[in-house]
Amino acid sequence: MALKDLFSGFFVVEEEDDELEAPPEENEQQERQQPKQQAQSQNQFTEQPRNVNSERPRSIQSVPKKQSTRLQQSSGERKYQMNNTTSKNNARNVVNMNNQEQENYDFTQESSKMCLFEPRVFSDTQDIADELKNRRATLVNLQRIDKVSAKRIIDFLSGTVYAIGGDIQRVGSDIFLCTPDNVEVAGSITDQIENMEYQGE
């Protein structure tokens, strides 16, 4: 009832001629209340200044609100209420670490996939970048493509790997390993690659 009382004087609605038929008891109550409401709405309408340019009066009119009691509270009470709400919010931020470890384990198993690519044209590079964006490691073999296109592909993949925070490593002559940020590569074979290049020349 308190909520109803709060909004009882907020809007004034004028009765329209098109009314649905109500049971006889309700008709009697409505007939008693109708003159009171009409007189009340006419008094409020005459109190408001009339707008010359308006074509017809509106059926719903706003009534000024009473000042809320919450604005009358002292600042000390407000600070106390703020402190109570923040302590309740902090209590809800507790996270179960076992569930988080299980989710991380599931995600690691799900993303432990490596894709092998041997692009023939530069447009195949977009497929490699899509796999990197999906957090999958890719191994790219550039032995069957010309040197100019291979350089363009490596430049493109270097930018992609940089954007996602991953890494690109050379693991053979014209073979590159591109990894996203969730994959860590241990060890290096740089000496072996350099020896292979010197022997090939």
Curated annotation (Swiss-Prot):
Record keywords: Cell cycle, Cell division, Cytoplasm, Septation
Ranges of Low complexity composition bias in the record: 35-44
Predominant location category: cytoplasm
Comp. bias (Polar residues): 59-88
Localization annotation: Cytoplasm
InterPro entries registered for this protein in UniProt: Cell_div_SepF, Cell_div_SepF/SepF-rel, SepF-like_sf
Pfam families found in the cross-reference section: SepF (PF04472)
GO biological process assignments: division septum assembly; FtsZ-dependent cytokinesis
Biased composition (Acidic residues): 13-28
Cellular compartments per GO CC: cytoplasm
Disordered: annotated span: 1-94
Subunit structure: Homodimer. Interacts with FtsZ.
Task of the protein: Cell division protein that is part of the divisome complex and is recruited early to the Z-ring. Probably stimulates Z-ring formation, perhaps through the cross-linking of FtsZ protofilaments. Its function overlaps with FtsA.
HAMAP family: SepF (MF_01197)
Record-stated family: Belongs to the SepF family.
Descriptive protein name: Cell division protein SepF
Species in which this protein is naturally found: Staphylococcus saprophyticus subsp. saprophyticus (strain ATCC 15305 / DSM 20229 / NCIMB 8711 / NCTC 7292 / S-41)
